[in-house]
A protein has these predicted regions:
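Membrane-embedded alpha-helical bundles that constitute the cytochrome b-like, heme-associated redox core
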Residues: 1-187
C-alpha cells in the first residue's frame, strides 16, 4: 500500500533512480551516435555491446523504479500549475516510463531478430526474445530509432520544464529532485 501523505521532496532512492537513469540515457545516445559513425569492425562492436549492456541496465532500473514508485508517493505538483500543465507533466512522466521499458525491449528484440547475442557486460547472455527474422529486424530497427528521437525530445522537454519551474515560476520543482538541496513546502 503506497504512503498516503505526499512528501515535500523526492526520496534519496527516487533521486538515485532519476539521476542514474538520466546519466545512462545520455551515455546511450553517445554510444549509439558514436557507433553509427563507425564502419563495421571491432570498435563498433564494442560500442554496440556496451550500448546493449547499458540498455539492459536501464530496463532493470526501470522495473525497480516502477516498483519503488508504486509504493512511494511522489511530491504533489505545485498548486500554481494550471490543469493543462499538470496534465502535460503527468503525461510526460508516463511517456518516460513507457520509453524506459520499450526502448530496451525493442533493442533486445532487434538483436534477437538478427540472432545477435545480448550480454550484460560480458557476465551473462540474455536469451533471444524472438526468432531470427530480417523483416522483424527492419521493423524493430525503425521503431527503436524513431522512439530514440521521441525519447530525446521528451528529455529536452523535461529539462526545459524543470528550468522553467526554477527560473520562471521560482518554485521548488527542480530542487526537490536535486540531491543535497533543501526544498520548501509552498502552499
Amino acid at each position: 500500500m503506497p504512503n498516503q501523505t505526499p512528501p515535500s521532496r523526492y526520496s534519496a532512492v527516487a533521486q538515485g533512480f532519476h539521476w542514474l537513469i538520466a546519466a545512462l540515457i545520455v551515455t546511450q545516445f553517445a554510444l549509439a551516435w558514436s557507433a553509427d559513425d563507425l564502419p563495421l569492425g571491432a570498435r563498433k562492436l564494442v560500442l554496440l555491446a556496451r550500448h546493449k549492456s547499458f540498455g539492459m541496465t536501464i530496463l532493470i532500473l526501470a522495473v525497480l523504479r516502477l516498483l519503488w514508485r508504486l509504493f512511494n508517493r511522489p511530491p504533489e505538483l505545485p498548486q500554481g500549475m494550471t490543469g493543462i500543465e499538470k496534465m502535460l507533466a503527468k503525461a510526460t512522466h508516463v511517456l518516460f516510463y513507457v520509453l524506459l521499458f520499450v526502448m530496451p525491449l525493442t533493442g533486445w528484440m532487434m538483436s534477437s531478430a538478427k540472432n545477435y547475442s545480448v550480454s550484460w557486460f560480458d557476465q551473462f547472455t540474455w536469451p533471444n526474445l524472438i526468432s531470427p527474422s530480417e523483416s522483424a529486424f527492419n521493423l524493430l530497427r525503425t521503431v527503436h530509432d524513431t522512439l530514440s528521437w521521441l525519447l530525446f525530445a521528451v528529455a529536452i522537454l523535461h529539462i526545459l520544464a524543470a528550468l522553467k519551474h526554477h527560473f520562471w515560476n521560482k518554485d521548488d520543482v527542480l530542487k526537490r529532485m536535486l540531491p543535497f538541496t533543501k526544498s520548501e513546502k509552498r502552499s
